[in-house]
Amino acid sequence: MIAKRIPGVEVLRVFAIFMVVLIHSTPEYTNGSGTNLAALILQSVSRAGFISFFLISGYFALNEKIVSLKKYYYNRVVTIVIPFLFYAYIHYFMVHYDFGRAANALSGFFSITTLADFLHAVIIGPAFNGSMFVSLHFWFIYWIVGAYAVVPFVGYVIQRIEPSSRLKSIAFLLGVSWLHLYVNRYFPNANIISIPFIADGWFVYFLIGGLLYGLELNKYRKYAFVCCAIGYVLTVFLTWFNFSMLSIYQAPYGIDINMVLCVCGFFIIFQTLRESFL
């Protein structure tokens, strides 16, 4: 069974947590803003750090040996869904009852109506709930629940791809993703036949994480530093270029080539850290 604790990857988890905090505490890049230099410097690294979570999740989840589907799904409900519902209910209550200061706060917390409204909001989801507020920041939980729901089936395929073919598989996934991404971004009016693509760029990172398992990553360590540097510089440049030169108000923070270089570089560097170094 794949080890659940690899020291270097644990350090990467901590780094990624700090990068999520950095994302939400630094300005976004916008035309004419006086904080754009800070945005370019900080957002360019924090976004890549955040995406590391998807590679880490795929690396472990897609290579897990699942013996019992019943036990697998039970464990995921207990460790992901139930804690989420518990925390989200408290969050929902605090938002709707003035952080517990409302006159009817105590009765509202134990109200069937509050519970029913909360479940309604959870089912609708953070993107479409309107006044039935569930924080947009919970989107990651919805994503991870969906990803883990298909892990037994996707992982079955991933685990049967030979190590010698895994880099080719990654190249294929990225080729399909980049073709769709860049044609639609830079040639939106091009009259081209529908291009197949994987709908969610985060899931591509998840798959890449799964495919990196079994590779001798130490061989790529020296290249990983170069990838990080190139990816970072490209992120800074493309963010400025898209906004200032092309009037495409979209930062390259998704499955873009710059992010892939930086994220994969981060993962290889941290995954290959020796315990003696830590």
PLM features per residue range, with description:
Residues 51, 79-83, 87, 172-176, ...:
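Hydrophobic alpha-helical membrane-embedded or membrane-associated segments
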Residues 54, 60-63, 80, 91-103, ...:
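Hydrophobic alpha-helical segments with transmembrane-like composition
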Residues 199-200, 217-278:
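Alpha-helical transmembrane segments and terminal signal-anchor/GPI-anchor hydrophobic tails
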Residues 18-25, 88-89, 172-186, 228-242:
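Aromatic-anchored segments of alpha-helical transmembrane domains
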Residues 35-44, 190-199, 247-256:
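Non-cytosolic membrane-interface motifs at loop->transmembrane helix junctions
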Residues 2-17, 73-74, 78-81, 220-233, ...:
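Functional transmembrane helices that form membrane-embedded active or gating regions
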Residues 4-16, 90, 100-105, 166-169, ...:
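Alpha-helical transmembrane segments of integral membrane proteins, especially early/N-terminal helices
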Residues 7-64, 80-88:
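Functionally critical transmembrane alpha-helices in membrane proteins and complexes, commonly lining
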